[in-house]
């Protein structure tokens, strides 16, 4: 195989620039889905069930996009057609979902419509997100991959901060933050509109600026094993061997998976209940149609942005730990403390501290698990398949947590703020399980 050429900074930037828009859409979804469904009239005890869809669609869509795009070649390229289609569907759904309460439907019909829109939004965001990772793998040499993923990480965090802040900024400039009962306020509706516009602009930019290698050139740099005529055979071989691979997986694979279970269950409860938790704790309200609740929703977006910025800072601290396991465990404990503090901090600005601590856990969750697993898998082969299977340790815990969320909320008296303590306990349990991991250097 030929050595892939070095790419200029701007070529690396163009490969991932569309990710900025996709991440804005993802941040708007993460921060506002519970708020939207509560405003539409969903019972808090049913709220977690809506959150089954995001991880479920991630498990289904990402492998399909990967497999199909391996076998695709057209005028737009190999990966970009899926990015393009996913982005356009996401834009359409982002314009429809926040208007679900304005269509004159009965509440049951509104919920069904909202669920269909959420499923399409999850599907399209996953469809638009996956090609960026693949294009780096396709076109960037080993020497530059760290730089390429650093650019992608920067755009990811920048997009998250922008998406989280939109409702707060629109309220600050005078857009109405309350609406009639069952209607999503203009601050949220326009956040989705502007997010959709930025998404399509960013994706169009990447589409126009990036030229993927045609099949012959792709073969020269990536080998025949990746070409479309061999994909079906490879796919069948991998499918038949998944059970064997899991049986032979190193113990670290399963031990890190156990830590992942507690971590991602905790994060699912944050995404589901934190708007209600902040509204209860700081503004003393559970009424989703009240002005106070909508202010809490906007402020939660600010807190998410602060968490993202805290995560970036803590990521620079992690390499300073001499012991990787210690860094992982300490980060999760700090995050657990952050979650547990949320119900006990009645100050709007005081809530910044818990979210900074949660950012520490988030930074470790993004970096540490794959470090341990890839170290342990050295010499095993099938690295790509193992990492694909390891993705289930992110999705399955969220699905299980979502199924159990309503029952646990009932056990804690229906107080969403108390669910933050549950999330904190889960993170501390995850930190305790870090001790079982044996890091292979």
How would you describe each model-predicted region?
Residues 325-369:
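C-terminal transmembrane helical hairpin of 12-TM major facilitator-type secondary transporters
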Residues 2-57, 255, 259, 263-287:
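Helix-loop boundary and gating motifs at the non-cytosolic
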Residues 1-9, 101, 105-116, 127-128, ...:
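Intracellular loop-helix junctions on the cytosolic face of multi-pass helical membrane proteins
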Residues 127-140, 364-379:
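Intracellular juxtamembrane helix-capping segments at the cytosolic ends
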Residues 43-53, 186, 284-308, 418:
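Loop-to-transmembrane helix entry
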Residues 44-45, 142-154, 379-390:
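Loop-to-transmembrane helix entry/capping segments in MFS-fold secondary transporters
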Residues 83-108, 334-346:
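C-terminal ends and interior cores of transmembrane alpha-helices
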Residues 93-128, 350-366:
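Hydrophobic core of transmembrane alpha-helices in multi-pass small-molecule transporters
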């Amino acid at each position: 195989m030929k050595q892939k050429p070095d790419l200029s900074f701007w070529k690396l930037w163009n490969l991932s620039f569309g990710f900025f828009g996709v991440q804005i859409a993802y941040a708007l979804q993460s921060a506002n889905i519970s708020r939207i469904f509560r405003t539409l009239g969903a019972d808090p005890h049913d709220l977690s069930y809506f959150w089954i869809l995001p991880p479920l669609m991630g498990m289904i869509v990402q492998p399909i996009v990967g497999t199909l795009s391996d076998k695709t070649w057209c005028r737009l390229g190999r990966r970009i057609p899926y990015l393009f289609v996913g982005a356009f569907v996401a834009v359409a759904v982002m314009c429809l979902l926040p208007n679900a309460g304005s269509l004159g439907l009965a509440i049951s019909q509104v919920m069904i419509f909202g669920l269909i829109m959420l499923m399409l939004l999850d599907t399209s965001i996953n469809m638009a997100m996956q090609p960026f990772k693949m294009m780096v793998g396709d076109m960037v040499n080993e020497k530059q991959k760290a730089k390429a993923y650093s650019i992608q990480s920067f755009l990811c965090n920048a997009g998250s901060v922008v998406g989280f802040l939109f409702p707060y900024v629109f309220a600050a400039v005078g857009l109405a933050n309350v609406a009639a009962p069952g209607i999503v306020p203009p601050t949220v509706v326009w956040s989705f509109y502007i997010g959709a516009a930025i998404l399509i602009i960013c994706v169009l930019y990447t589409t126009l600026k990036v030229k993927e290698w045609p099949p012959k050139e792709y073969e020269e740099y990536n080998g025949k094993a990746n070409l479309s005529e061999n994909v079906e055979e490879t796919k069948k071989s991998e499918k038949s061997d998944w059970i064997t691979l899991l049986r032979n997986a190193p113990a670290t694979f399963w031990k890190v998976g156990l830590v992942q279970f507690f971590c991602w269950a905790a994060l699912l409860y944050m995404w589901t209940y934190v708007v209600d938790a902040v509204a209860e704790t700081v503004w003393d309200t559970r009424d989703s149609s009240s002005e106070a609740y909508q202010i809490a929703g906007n402020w939660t977006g600010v807190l998410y942005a602060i968490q993202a910025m805290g995560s970036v800072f803590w990521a620079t601290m992690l390499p300073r730990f001499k012991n990787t396991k210690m860094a992982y465990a300490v980060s999760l404990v700090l995050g657990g403390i952050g979650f547990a503090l949320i119900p006990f901090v009645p100050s709007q600005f005081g809530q910044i501290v818990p979210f900074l601590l949660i950012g520490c856990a988030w930074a470790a969750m993004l970096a540490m698990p794959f470090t341990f697993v890839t170290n342990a898998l050295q010499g095993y082969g099938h690295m790509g398949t193992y990492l694909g299977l390891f993705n289930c340790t992110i999705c399955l815990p969220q699905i299980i947590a979502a199924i159990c969320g309503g029952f646990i909320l009932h056990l804690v008296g229906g107080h969403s703020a108390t669910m933050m303590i549950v999330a904190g306990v889960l993170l501390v349990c995850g930190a305790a399980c870090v001790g079982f991991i044996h890091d292979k250097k």
